[in-house]
């Protein structure tokens, strides 16, 4: 891990909701000179989401100390074929079973398939399948305070790249102490490609759900012999991280 060279960074976050239900979220870690670009882009994104216009949109900007930021490489990327959800789910179980037991792999998949309107991720013990996040069940754990290195940032765009944004988030998640895997299915009803991460590899899998399905969420699997939930959650939610190698 390298420390970022001197710049003035800010963390920008957006959360949009209606009647208490999550609609959209986005965030980045950027040089302060680009803050207005991203604030405007995130506000537009919140108001053009496929789930409809939100009742409440919250934009937050926070200055980050340069000395606190670390830089890590992006995960390697691999794609697996699947023609329909049942085949995609078999691929997920097979990949997860390389790092946890088949029973825990099944539990993790079942958990993400039953997630609805989560603002964050569900944290599960990689040995027992027990849920470890201590918050409101609809909040979960928020992987936060991350972005790409300045030379790789193409700037904000209204038409977001699901792949690039997911790769950046997953790269931070897998750098957290004790995290051995992640499963994600987008909560965007029109986007059906999901991913699983294991052993420093981001594995894209199409057709993780039927088109316009309300399914959507993410699960992190934690090896509690390596790190406590408290330490891992602190890193995921608070440690500023820049990702390099995102094309």
UniProtKB/Swiss-Prot annotation:
GO terms for molecular function: 6-carboxyhexanoate-CoA ligase activity; ATP binding; magnesium ion binding. Its EC number is 6.2.1.14. Its cofactor is Mg(2+). It catalyses: heptanedioate + ATP + CoA = 6-carboxyhexanoyl-CoA + AMP + diphosphate. Coiled coil: none annotated. Pfam families: BioW. Pathway: Metabolic intermediate metabolism; pimeloyl-CoA biosynthesis; pimeloyl-CoA from pimelate: step 1/1. Keywords: ATP-binding, Biotin biosynthesis, Ligase, Magnesium, Nucleotide-binding. The keyword ATP-binding applies. InterPro entries: BioW. GO terms for biological process: biotin biosynthetic process. Catalyzes the transformation of pimelate into pimeloyl-CoA with concomitant hydrolysis of ATP to AMP. Belongs to the BioW family. Homodimer. This is 6-carboxyhexanoate--CoA ligase. It comes from Corynebacterium diphtheriae (strain ATCC 700971 / NCTC 13129 / Biotype gravis). The lineage of its organism: Bacteria, Bacillati, Actinomycetota, Actinomycetes, Mycobacteriales.
């Amino acid at each position: 891990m390298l420390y970022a060279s001197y710049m003035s960074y800010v963390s920008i976050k957006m959360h949009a909701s209606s009647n208490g239900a999550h609609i959209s979220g986005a965030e980045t870690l950027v040089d302060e000179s680009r803050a207005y670009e991203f604030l405007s882009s995130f506000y537009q994104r919140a108001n053009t989401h496929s789930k409809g216009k939100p009742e409440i949109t919250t934009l937050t900007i926070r200055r980050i100390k340069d000395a606190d930021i670390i830089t890590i490489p992006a995960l390697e990327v691999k794609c697996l074929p699947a023609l329909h959800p049942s085949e995609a789910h078999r691929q997920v179980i097979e990949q997860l079973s390389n790092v946890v037991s088949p029973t825990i792999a099944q539990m993790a998949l079942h958990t993400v398939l039953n997630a609805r309107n989560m603002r964050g991720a569900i944290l599960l013990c990689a040995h027992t399948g027990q849920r470890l996040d201590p918050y409101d069940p609809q909040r979960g754990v928020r992987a936060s305070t991350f972005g790409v290195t300045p030379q790789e940032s193409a700037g904000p765009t209204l038409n977001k790249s699901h792949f690039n944004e997911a790769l950046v988030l997953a790269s931070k998640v897998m750098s957290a102490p004790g995290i051995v895997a992640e499963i994600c299915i987008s909560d965007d009803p029109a986007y059906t490609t999901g991913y699983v991460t294991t052993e420093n590899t981001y594995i894209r899998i199409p057709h993780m759900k039927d088109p316009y399905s309300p399914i959507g969420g993410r699960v992190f699997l934690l090896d509690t012999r390596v790190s406590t939930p408290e330490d891992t959650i602190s890193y995921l939610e608070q440690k500023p991280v820049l990702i390099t190698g995102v094309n």
